[in-house]
Design a protein with these regions (language model features):
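Catalytic alpha-helical scaffold of carbohydrate-active enzymes acting on polysaccharides/glycoconjugates
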Residues: 1-205, 213-238
Length: 238
């Protein structure tokens, strides 16, 4: 268990959200962030920078939508963090990722400080089995039927999907494992942490499971919120 932290302004615990941009549309998302803003929760909104080459049903809006981009810039002015969720919802080659990062900086006047890999994009960095080392990697391969041991190539210098050097340059924090416990810090007490076996990521962080309504509500139940406060913990909902 992480030793109790003295949080700023005498706060008893931390709660924030990393919002995965999958299936987002402007109308619904604006309502959610209006509520968060009224409650003074300055959370993280991830984005896709450009439209993908291959359309995917329900993939969600990207920063190429001018109305959406203008709204994101207003969010940023209010104190919300804009995160990176890969350049787009399709796999991106090295040059495409570099162009996406450059466009992100131009759009938001800053590097994307935080990111999460998107689903099954081949340029995902240290994703799938590559998140693990030693015996844990072997166990993961067995549990997944060796289906994901070679797919992700963002860290592989020989791959056209390699962008590890750009990740090191542009990104400070990359999301790794997700836990069912509301107290993310309790599940991963060393975050943000470094893994010297994975040199292209500066720092890793974990999060708590909330990828659908049922899991989100279960994780942030009143009972769990009370425990988070009692433990003086930190929750990063994903």
């Amino acid at each position: 268990m992480h030793p109790k932290i003295l949080w700023p302004n005498n706060k008893k615990f931390v709660f924030t959200i990393f919002d995965d941009t999958d299936r987002a549309n402007l109308n619904d998302t604006k309502l959610v962030y209006q509520c968060l803003d009224e409650l003074n929760f300055k959370t993280t909104k991830s984005v896709w920078v450009v439209e993908g080459k291959r359309k995917q049903e329900g993939h969600g809006v990207t920063c190429e939508d001018k109305k959406y981009l203008n709204w994101l810039l207003e969010l940023k002015k209010k104190g919300f963090e804009i995160g990176y969720h890969n350049t787009t919802y399709n796999s991106s080659f090295r040059q495409e990722t570099e162009e996406g990062l450059t466009k992100f900086v131009k759009m938001f006047n800053q590097n994307p400080k935080v990111m999460a890999n998107h689903s099954a994009n081949e340029e995902n960095i240290y994703w799938g089995v590559h998140r693990l080392s030693g015996s844990r990697k072997i166990i993961y391969n067995i549990l997944t039927g060796f289906k994901k041991n070679k797919f992700y190539k963002g860290h592989d210098e020989s791959s056209p999907y390699f962008w590890g050097d750009f990740c090191k340059e542009y990104i400070t924090y990359v999301r790794n494992f997700v836990f069912s416990d509301i107290n993310t810090l309790k599940s991963c007490p060393y975050m943000p942490y470094q893994d010297h076996a994975k040199p292209y990521v500066n720092y890793w962080f974990a999060s708590s499971e909330g990828n659908n309504v049922e899991r989100f509500n279960k994780c942030i139940s009143d009972e769990n919120q009370d425990r988070l406060e009692e433990e003086g913990g930190a929750c990063i909902m994903y």
